[in-house]
């Protein structure tokens, strides 16, 4: 993997005025020995999984002259089976929808519920793509701020709902980039507020949709609830999931949405025709045949996260212990008082370790790798912090 040069848009092209000077989103993709910056599952699919995927794709290859099932019914059935097993929540095909990664799911939600004159509300710090979805759909993006420990400030969020009258409220659990879980009681308070809240520019009786992005939810501690459990109780709740993280399927680009049928039907209006290729559907169905294997490393990654959090808390920078955000994801936000995080990033990169400069000033994020990768990260970080301290 390598980085391409930055955008150089010719002046004669009629690029939208609001896009002039913008750069494409993307974390660095570099050829380094230890890549810990994009929150992937570091373990490749088992040979049996690879074999099944290859066989299922081979089986559908003779049909590639025809369009795929645009409603991807079999895949939606597989989502249902998986979620009942993983979360104990039974959902019908009508309550599920798939797309090319949860990025496309989120974009479809913004297309359906955002637009000119509409507002979407998030809670800062949060995933950096949300404002880009808003920009791309001409939706106004507003923020409520989190507490100092990155938990949701429910009172501030509810006040923002009342003040800005959003069509969408976007929450993330575990939150990216902090890893902070969303407490069920906090989510319920937001859902209750949204039930009666007004939407700017909409007719009376229209209320906002609450979207919970659960891209990293499989890494939560055992027994921690999921927002899926509330779908039957709240008709205004939509939950986004992905196969990219815990399920070790990032290269296939498969995300999915769980919600009541009304929300799914709204998304179906804006989806592109035949948006999920036959190859994608076949590969995803094959992966679900091996759910145990695909999730086999999650418990170990959770243990690695907990051990790494404890280790980071023992480290110091300029005489102060590192701050470490509470996390139930496969990544950790740490630092808190780094006064030159860009140099720390560069020095780590020189040693073959790639992490992420993201989140509030003074913080950095590292995702969990293999045991060997994490050992190299620890060794490099200790060395780099001492070097940067010396100026």
UniProtKB/Swiss-Prot annotation:
One family name in Pfam for this protein: Aminotran_1_2
EC numbers for this chain: 2.6.1.9
The protein's enzyme class: transferase
Catalyzed reactions per annotation: L-histidinol phosphate + 2-oxoglutarate = 3-(imidazol-4-yl)-2-oxopropyl phosphate + L-glutamate
Highest taxon above the source species: Bacteria
PROSITE patterns the UniProt entry points to: AA_TRANSFER_CLASS_2 (PS00599)
Keywords: Amino-acid biosynthesis, Aminotransferase, Histidine biosynthesis, Pyridoxal phosphate, Transferase
Gene Ontology molecular function: any one: histidinol-phosphate transaminase activity
PTM sites of type N6-(pyridoxal phosphate)lysine: 245
Pathway the protein takes part in: Amino-acid biosynthesis; L-histidine biosynthesis; L-histidine from 5-phospho-alpha-D-ribose 1-diphosphate: step 7/9
Cofactor needs: pyridoxal 5'-phosphate
Gene Ontology biological process terms, A to Z: L-histidine biosynthetic process
Family: Belongs to the class-II pyridoxal-phosphate-dependent aminotransferase family. Histidinol-phosphate aminotransferase subfamily.
Oligomeric form and interacting partners: Homodimer.
Protein's name in the database: Histidinol-phosphate aminotransferase
